[in-house]
């Protein structure tokens, strides 16, 4: 009887619609991660928390099962959901890498891969052949638009991070070509409710307005006392701008260093200004908790007007604005920025 029940259970599982099997695997994995997270939250000692942190469920076993479903159902429309999950949720496993290759071959012309294709913006240049294949072979608007966006985003990031002028300029031109085609032919396409052209517009703005030598876009708002002020109020001085938030653990360690820099440079024709991205009540708490000694614009969220204008992707982010209001250093280290200010002051003596 037991044997018959087991055979029946296996038969029922294999007979379940493919979409149900895929969703079931994803839910099983996500529920196991969620349950482990709840254990970490509920743990009363650091030792207990570390115990659960070291036992976070791996996506590996689920990736193996998911790839088996893919291989057995290559011609089924719903299988793209499995491929998409492998590419986005199991990218570091062999099955995820295999799915990425399949996305550029077997599934390059399929409908339903747009969300996974968009996520390839985070895979860097190794994803370029896949994205080019989708652009060439796929006739569906969402998929082609997602590939153009992701490829443009990869080239944009290479341009933004490159220290090689020739490589950087080539990357910029490739990004511009992708984004211009996206804006011309697919301006209305949305992925998960967001227009791809809007994301591209932010990167286009950054390429042309947020580079070293550009005039820094105006930063303006109210400080913790409700007093309005602007970046341009400090024209004639070196201005170190830090985008940060109390929610950002990586920001906590640099705040005392920013205070030190503000004190060190106060007689060096330089100031430190912050753009805080917490909601107003949390911002005031963060300013007090970390004893922030420099003036801040309260932007209220990570999508506040100043943070959005500067297209922030990482926190903290530092800029140095020179006395003429031009960007002198972008995404630089505090040490490099302070050294530049001191060197400029010494050169004037």
What are these regions (language model features)?
Residues 12-60:
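N-terminal leader/linker segments that initiate helical-solenoid repeat arrays
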Residues 288-293, 298-343:
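Thiol/disulfide oxidoreductase modules built on the thioredoxin-like
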Residues 34, 84-91, 118-122, 151-163, ...:
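Specific register positions within alpha-helical solenoid repeats of the TPR/Sel1-like families, i.e.
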Residues 122, 167-224, 232-235, 285-288, ...:
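N-proximal helix/coil linker or "cap" segments that precede and/or mark the start of modular domains
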Residues 69-79, 89-125, 134-145, 161-173, ...:
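Short solvent-exposed coil/turn linkers within tandem alpha-helical repeat scaffolds
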Residues 237-239, 244-247, 279, 314:
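Short pre-active-site segment immediately N-terminal to redox-active cysteine/selenocysteine motifs
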Residues 235, 243-260:
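Conserved redox-active cysteine motifs that mediate thiol-disulfide chemistry
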Residues 252-291, 301-308:
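Structural microenvironment flanking redox-active thiols in thiol-disulfide oxidoreductases
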